[in-house]
Amino acid sequence: MIDALDVARMDRFWLDATRGRTGGLQLRFVPTMKPKAAHKNRLHLDLAGGPDWEAEVARLLTLGATRADIGQGDVPWDVLADPEGNEFCVLRPGHPGVLADSGLVAICLDVSEEERYAQRAFWQSQADWHAVESHDWGVRLRRAPASTVSLVMGPPAAPKEARNRLRLEVTQRDREPGEFLDASGNEFHVTG
């Protein structure tokens, strides 16, 4: 779920940005009156840039994205922000773990080095996703080995400055619906 000042605009932007390819996951926008307060979101989305990633970045900029500098330095991806300032990355060809040429390919959760294994265990139990990679950069979970979208957790962890604008939502039939905190204090939602 993504907090949005203008739900219709954000829904349209992300539908176009992902080309409707979200690996079966739903991006849900929740109305809010509060603009983004944190310097950097603790959760962000990664899109595949495809073989012509420069053209994909240009396309996203024409949709309303802007370039963003979060101190990333020289990295093999481009950091952009959606129309409400939420950062997302456009991964270049050959990026490890990318199983699609376009659309949403990762949900990235900032966690500290010390918390990543606890977070892996936590999200495996909450979402029933499975670890497929574990490296010094973090861990990657998928619903199934061929799922195009992964949950990537790793450092550096952005400081918790405010309520997260982007939050994970899971469906659990055996748990009371509501908002909860994960092992690092990130809000997430449970639906029945």
Regions found by a protein language model. Give the residues of each.
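Short hydrophobic/aromatic beta-strand micro-patches
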Residues: 3, 46-50, 110, 169-173
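Hydrophobic, helix-prone linear segments
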Residues: 1-24, 30-39
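Short, conserved charged micro-motifs
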Residues: 8-12, 52-57, 115-118, 174-176
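Vicinal oxygen chelate
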Residues: 16, 24-30, 61-111, 125, ...
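Short acidic/Ser/Thr-enriched loop-to-helix initiation segments
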Residues: 118-126
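Structured alpha/beta or helical-core interaction and ligand-binding surfaces enriched in interleaved
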Residues: 20, 117, 133
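Terminal peptide-recognition signature
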Residues: 14, 45, 123, 168
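Short, solvent-exposed beta-strand edge segments and adjacent coil->beta transition regions
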Residues: 40-44, 102-106, 163-167
